[in-house]
């Protein structure tokens, strides 16, 4: 993320928001970090209990959000800009910047396979458990993490476009456009297309009730996450492109305020997912309350009952109960590697 405070620290009047950024980012870190850690704990229990692909993706998303809060909110904004009030040496600073881009790209792109997973679950339910299963999900998550890190290496040369003496180059334009495409335009296009298909499918079959708790709740969580992401990240993308192609900076103070607000909104996305899950999912809300109660009372949580094998029944969610006897149910159990094994009914 761009540095706008360190080079303005010598002139306190240059920071139009005063102490608002440091208070905001401190609050965001103190709120978001425990919330995401609690999310990881709860989703880890759900993954062990139910072996659902969607829980694995949400778990990976929470882990990526923790990395974003650490590298960007703590190291970049709080430690460097407000505590040290000076920029780090060039090489360590650039390495941290690569890790920042890697974490934010991972946080965004881990939602893409989750969207694809929900699309298959809703639109192709009979194929869902042969396409999406725990072993494959873990491979997809690992691939996203590795790919996002490797593709973030070129951001070692990311320019600070907000300095007054910045000189634009063609390489900088390429990096900025790649950033805008990879963190916003491409993911939002995928979210919009697949979510539109899912909504169309749900509306077309609105006279039937969804079978299964997780399909409806997870899909609602997906819609909420992607909608909030598109809304909160839009100001940052607009600011970057406007500054790159708009008029030269005439009022650095105003630009500084606008960029601060844009970054605040974008990073808010990493701290609120826990509260969205609690609002939408009763199961998640109940487990969160139980975990917090056990934590504050320093007691172990009750031992949950786990079966030796995880079973799931795959059928179309649009089949009415009256005609369900005409449909052959496909029952899958997972082996020790998380791959589905079809069992004859």
UniProtKB/Swiss-Prot annotation:
CDD domains: 7tmA_GPR139. Signal peptide: none annotated. One of its GO terms (biological process) is phospholipase C-activating G protein-coupled receptor signaling pathway. InterPro entries: GPCR_Rhodpsn (IPR000276), GPCR_Rhodpsn_7TM (IPR017452), GPR139 (IPR037486), Orphan_GPCR1 (IPR052477). The keyword ATP-binding does not apply. It is a multi-pass membrane protein. GO terms for molecular function: G protein-coupled receptor activity; identical protein binding; neuropeptide receptor activity. Residues 1-21, 79-94, 162-173, 242-260 are extracellular. GO terms for cellular component: plasma membrane. It is found in: Cell membrane. The chain crosses the membrane at residues 22-42, 58-78, 95-115, 141-161, 174-194, 221-241, 261-281. Expressed almost exclusively in the brain. Abundantly expressed in the ventrolateral region of caudate putamen, the habenular nucleus, the zona incerta, and the medial mammillary nucleus. Residues 43-57, 116-140, 195-220, 282-345 are cytoplasmic. Keywords: Cell membrane, G-protein coupled receptor, Glycoprotein, Membrane, Receptor, Transducer, Transmembrane, Transmembrane helix. Glycans are attached at residue 11. It comes from the Eukaryota. Orphan receptor. Seems to act through a G(q/11)-mediated pathway. Belongs to the G-protein coupled receptor 1 family. This is Probable G-protein coupled receptor 139.
């Amino acid at each position: 993320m761009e540095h706008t405070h360190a080079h303005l620290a010598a002139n306190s009047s240059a920071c139009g928001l005063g102490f608002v950024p440091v208070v905001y980012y401190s609050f965001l870190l103190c709120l978001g970090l425990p919330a995401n850690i609690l999310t990881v704990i709860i989703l880890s229990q759900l993954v062990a209990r139910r072996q659902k692909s969607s829980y694995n993706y949400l778990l990976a998303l929470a882990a990526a959000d923790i990395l974003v809060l650490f590298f960007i909110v703590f190291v970049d904004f709080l430690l460097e800009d407000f505590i040290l009030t000076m920029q780090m040496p060039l090489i360590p600073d650039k390495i941290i910047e690569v890790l920042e881009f890697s974490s934010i790209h991972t946080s965004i792109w881990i939602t893409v396979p989750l969207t694809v997973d929900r699309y298959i679950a809703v639109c192709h339910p009979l194929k869902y458990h042969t396409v999406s299963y725990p072993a494959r999900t873990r491979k997809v998550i690992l691939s996203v993490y590795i790919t996002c890190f490797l593709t973030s290496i070129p951001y070692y040369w990311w320019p600070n476009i907000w300095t007054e003496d910045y000189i634009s180059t063609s390489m900088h334009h390429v990096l900025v456009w790649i950033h805008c495409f990879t963190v916003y335009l491409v993911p939002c296009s995928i979210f919009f297309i697949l979510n539109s298909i899912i909504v169309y499918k749900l509306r077309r079959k609105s006279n039937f009730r969804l079978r299964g708790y997780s399909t409806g709740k997870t899909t609602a969580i997906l819609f909420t996450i992607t909608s909030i992401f598109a809304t909160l990240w839009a100001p940052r993308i607009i600011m970057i492109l406007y500054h790159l192609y708009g008029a030269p900076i005439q009022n650095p103070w105003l630009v500084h305020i606008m960029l601060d607000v844009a970054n605040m909104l974008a990073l808010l996305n990493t701290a609120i997912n826990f509260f969205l899950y609690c609002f939408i999912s009763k199961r998640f809300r109940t487990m969160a309350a139980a975990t917090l109660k056990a934590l504050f009372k320093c007691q172990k949580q009750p031992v949950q009952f786990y079966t030796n094998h995880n079973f799931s029944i795959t059928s179309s969610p649009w089949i009415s109960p009256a005609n369900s006897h005409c449909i052959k149910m496909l029952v899958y159990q997972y082996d020790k590697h998380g791959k589905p094994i079809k069992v004859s009914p």
